[in-house]
UniProtKB/Swiss-Prot annotation:
Misc note: In plants, chitin acts as a microbe-associated molecular pattern (MAMP) that is recognized by lysin motif (LysM)-containing plant cell surface-localized pattern recognition receptors (PRRs) that activate a plethora of downstream immune responses.
Name of the molecule in the record: Non-secreted LysM effector LysM5
Keyword annotations of the record: Chitin-binding, Repeat, Virulence
Region of interest (Disordered), ranges: 420-485, 538-559
Coiled-coil features, chain-numbered ranges: none
Ranges of Low complexity composition bias in the record: 538-549
A single MF term (Gene Ontology): chitin binding
Summary of the knockout phenotype: Leads to enhanced fungal virulence, with faster decaying on infected fruits.
Biased composition (Gly residues): 432-450
Amino acid sequence: MAQFNLYPGVPSDLLSTAFNISSGCLTALNATLSCDQDLFSMAGNADGFFWSDDNATALCTGACQSSAASWWNSCADACANDQLNAYGRIYPAQTVPGRFVDGLNIVCVTANTDLTLDVGINGTITNSTFLDNSTTASATSENLVSRQISSISQYCLVQSYDWVGSDIIRPDCTDPANSNSSQCVDPTDVPPENERLANLYPDDLLCSQCFLSMFYLRIASPFLPDVDHSDYLVDQWFDILDICNATSKVPDLLVRNLPYYQYAPGESDNWVDNTTYGFSDLQPLGGNGTTNVTCQARSINLADLNPPEIDYTTQTTCDVMAPFLNASTGDIWQMYQNPDCMPDFDYTEIPVVCLPFSCSVTQLNANTTCDQFVATLPAIGNNTITTTQFLSWNPNLIGICDNTTEQYVCTSAPGGTYISPPTNITTSSGDSRGGGDGSGTSTGSSGVGGSSRNSTLVAPGGTPPSPTQSGIPSTCDRYAQAQSGDGCDSFSQDFGITSQQLETWNPVLGSNGENCLTQFFAGYWYCVGLVGSATSTATTTTTSSTGVPTPSPVQSGIDPQCTKYSEAVSGDSCIAFASANNITPAQLYSWNPVLGSGGSNCGSDFWANEYYCVGAPDGSATTTTAPTSTAVATPSPIQSGIDPQCTKFAEAASGDSCPGFATKNGITATELYSWNPVLGAGGANCNSDFWANEYYCVGAPGS
């Protein structure tokens, strides 16, 4: 009978000493399996060998798969607290059998394997059915005649050796017709359609059970590398599911918190030292929380902490400190750089440490998957919490998502939990961006997927809607709610701001939007306007030169002689809006220059829930720009609040600063701030609201 041992012929006492692991873990790792020694060793690096049908058949016996499943489960229990030091890294000992079983799954999968019983996914594949004569239909394509699927082997891995494809589609650059193709000019400039997997394989191969099962096992593996190509594969997976309508053919993809194997500086007392857990060296924080290390969240003064008494017969320090500090166990480990949830350093040297913003904490039981746990959490408003959200709230989760340890975790976004919308805000539903191109086209089509949008105005300093994420500036006076299908770019376009503004006003998204894929959540509110920004005006009203109060929000450039305003609603077009207010489209465009000459900008700048001028003295009906009292035409784009007596404008260029711009235009910085209130008193808003390619007032009477 075939037998496999991980460490055959080596005395267990020597191994235990060499590996510095418990004897129980070593016994579990070195258990005898009913598998061929050579073939099972090959399974530990399945893609490093060329498998024949005979090899796979000899390995994939019921006895081998059953003993492999038992081995995996036994090591998960016996090695839960053991680490191995190899290749300069520390990693959980239980990952050793995990990699073997992961390879076994790849070698043994057939078109008839029940993936829900796969040991690497959820249990065991022992009961999977293998049909001796199972085949998969051959792929056909007039352009891909070489892509034939083997009908000899029942094993998908062996079949896959006959799946011939291409990494990308390359145009024939010798053909003069393709001489201007971007891909021929720059081979690295590959359009998305030329690297889409669905375009690289014919549908009958792409949608075959073997192709789907192999693809699923690879991206569901807990050992999927954390590289860009893995992200590409996951994106392609969901595309393939849509094309093949195959969601019922494979389990849902389990979202895991990627493991990070720390560098290995050494071990002591059964715990690797602090560096092993990825703890950076603590730097002293000032007692007031201003430090030589920036704390972006809570500064905790250790001398002021007064935690509850701990009953060590039934509790651990972590059991008490996590609810006391309203932080996850993993975050407290990170704060103290100690898995005992208590500091082991001198308070006088490091009096203050940094901890994330507070969150609601709940105890996560051991051996619960993230997906299972998240499914038990109540919704936030009408939005179900996702595993991706949960992982973003718990960046220091202890363990991986399909094998967690008992710990406290955040079940709300650090920095804020759900509250009912406040009563001092005005909420409107409907598209935030109007449609229409001047020809009567209805608004409402520019939201993502044509769905409705929610935007909310908040008085400066007022309570924002909820839920939001941390870091939004207090001067934000306009919020918008993201919904399913939104991306950072489309969301910013829908609300008339740039992607850079969205990322600046919502720091959680990253300075260059690098966190948009992981931190941009449906159901959450994001800042889309600051007080005085070009896309947002304060809820306090101003008065036009006719004495008529100016409502909010409005866009820039409205005729200062306006005598009447009206709010656009979802479904309006420029023409319909003009007709409903008993004016001509020409008057609407004249009094609201943002809509463009002849309504050329109606498709992009006519927004639901914004106010537009619908009444002005007859003398201004033919004016397409808002004249100042000195008859100087107002250029575009400008920001709100500019002195109506402005006699001169200048355009800011990339790299300009407020003081430099003022000097360049022969005025003082004080004058610049006075004539352009959006820049704030003393230029307080220059860093956020002084934009290149915008016009600012640089001349006024008496200057």
